């Protein structure tokens, strides 16, 4: 029950336990737990927008954790805030992106629809490359970036994809370089059908001119999505790993051999 949850965070015992865990540096995980890096983006009290919880706590003479819980109790879902838990050091991030041991994969946004919107990793990487080049600090060429997002991934996972070759299945994304702008970082909200809630999304409307799957135009700027997308077959197919051998049944032992991979790169 929502009311019980808000009542819970006002219990002195709960807050004391919460502060204890926040201060335990050896158990820090994905989030750094530093409320001085928790910045208010939306609040009925507009004077608080742009401030972090430590600043608010200093103004009211309370601990940053208490400032956070007090505001959360008072404004509930009308209070919005953000923090940075990754990619805070560009020079390190550039090295990681350029490393042959790094893949630009997926975000965990699908499991956190109300708090994360990192669906556009590939576009965000292209913006990192573009921004660095404009600053005269290029760490990767455009061609290397596209290769890392396509052929590099396909070759690693043994998929017949990621290359443009005569006779291949036509899976193509047409990107407008001028659309790789600050909008790539903007977060929007959109209704999630069937659940009665809004989820966080990133639009990137100016970045993608068209998406072609298996030779069929799935999306075209201005025309939006094909009416058959997600309803009719033909837009995609199962991509089999070409490194996996066929499973064979050993009739004598009645056992099944496990798939064998040709090689791993570590």
List each model region and its residues.
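Active-site neighborhoods of metal-dependent hydrolases
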Residues: 1-139, 178
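Flexible loop/turn segments at secondary-structure boundaries
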Residues: 74-78, 111-115, 153-156, 180-183, ...
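Hydrophobic alpha-helix feature that most strongly marks membrane-spanning transmembrane helices
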Residues: 73, 101, 127-134, 150-154, ...
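Acidic, glycine-enriched loop/beta-strand segments at the rims
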Residues: 79-87, 93, 140-144, 154-189
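Intein/HINT protein-splicing elements and their conserved insertion hotspots or analogous self-processing inserts
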Residues: 219-266
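C-terminal cap of metal-dependent C-N hydrolases
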Residues: 95-102, 107, 121, 174-231
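Alpha-helix capping and helix-loop boundary segments enriched in small/acidic/polar residues
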Residues: 113-117, 161, 199
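Hydrophobic, well-ordered secondary-structure elements that form the walls
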Residues: 61, 108, 126, 145, ...
């Amino acid at each position: 029950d929502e009311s019980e949850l808000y009542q819970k965070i006002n219990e002195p015992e709960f807050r004391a336990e919460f502060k204890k865990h926040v201060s335990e540096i050896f158990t820090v995980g994905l989030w750094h737990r530093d409320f001085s890096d928790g910045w208010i983006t939306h609040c009925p009290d507009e004077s608080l927008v742009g401030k972090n919880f430590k600043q608010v706590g200093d103004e009211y003479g309370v601990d940053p954790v208490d400032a956070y819980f007090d505001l959360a109790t008072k404004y509930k879902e009308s209070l919005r805030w953000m923090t940075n838990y990754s990619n805070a050091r560009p020079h390190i991030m550039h090295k990681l992106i350029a490393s042959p041991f790094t893949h630009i994969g997926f975000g965990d946004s699908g499991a956190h629809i109300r708090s994360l919107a990192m669906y556009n990793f590939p576009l965000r990487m292209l913006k990192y490359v573009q921004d660095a080049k404009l600053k005269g600090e290029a760490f990767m060429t455009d061609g290397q970036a596209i290769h890392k997002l396509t052929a590099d991934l396909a070759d690693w996972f043994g998929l017949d994809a990621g290359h443009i070759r005569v006779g291949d299945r036509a899976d193509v994304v047409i990107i407008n370089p001028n659309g790789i702008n600050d909008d790539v970082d903007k977060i929007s909200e959109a209704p999630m059908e069937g659940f009665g809630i809004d989820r966080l999304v990133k639009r990137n409307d100016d970045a993608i001119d068209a998406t072609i799957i298996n030779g069929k135009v799935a999306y075209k700027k201005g025309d939006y999505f094909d009416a058959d997308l997600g309803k009719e077959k033909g837009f995609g197919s199962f991509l089999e790993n070409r490194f996996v051998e066929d499973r064979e049944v050993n009739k004598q032992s009645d056992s099944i051999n496990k798939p064998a991979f040709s090689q791993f790169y570590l």
